[in-house]
A protein has these predicted regions:
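C-terminal motif of bacterial Sec signal peptides marking the signal peptidase cleavage site
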Residues: 2-5
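Bacterial signal peptide processing site
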Residues: 7-9
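Post-signal peptide N-terminal segment of mature Sec-exported envelope proteins
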Residues: 14-32
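Structural signature of eukaryotic scaffold interfaces centered on beta-propeller domains
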Residues: 27, 35-40, 88-93
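A low-complexity, Ser/Thr/Gly/Pro-enriched, surface-exposed linker/loop concept
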Residues: 57-85, 123
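Short, solvent-exposed interaction modules
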Residues: 75-113
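C-terminal partner/receptor-binding element of secreted or periplasmic proteins
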Residues: 107, 111-127
Length: 127
């Protein structure tokens, strides 16, 4: 954006332009609120709310809309009112397990996804 073609009393327009550009740059570099992580099952992803650690399982299909769904894996927020990018997921060698890292506290969690609701969980890894 350029405001300098307008009247510029006291250099205020340049200052406003600098502030707008700074906000635009910060917004462009901002961490996303949600991230999709592929699983080794080609039809399934984990959707992570990077602010609070909530996770859902997302399945897509190229043939049938009834095979598309999103299920909650963990609907419990691990923290409140945090900035995007706090939590990340790292895949493991096990197809159903990920490690979740709280990048602020260093706490790690074992995340297990499954089609069977009883086998889904997020649990802290003890230090």
């Amino acid at each position: 954006m350029c405001f300098t073609s307008c009247s510029n009393k006291g250099g205020k327009l340049e200052e406003i332009e600098k502030q707008v550009n700074k906000i635009a740059l910060n917004t462009a570099n901002a961490e996303p609120i949600y991230k999709l992580y592929p699983t080794r099952n080609m039809w399934n992803f984990l959707k992570l709310d990077t602010r609070n650690g909530k996770i859902s399982i997302v399945q897509f299909s190229v043939e049938d809309n009834e095979k598309q769904f999103e299920y909650e894996l963990s609907n419990k927020a691990l923290c409140e009112n945090n900035a995007p990018g706090r939590f990340i997921l790292q895949p493991t060698e096990n197809i159903y397990n990920f490690i979740m890292l709280d990048q602020m506290s260093g706490q790690t969690y074992q995340v297990q996804w499954s089609f069977d609701e009883e086998k889904r969980f997020v649990t802290p890894i003890q230090k």
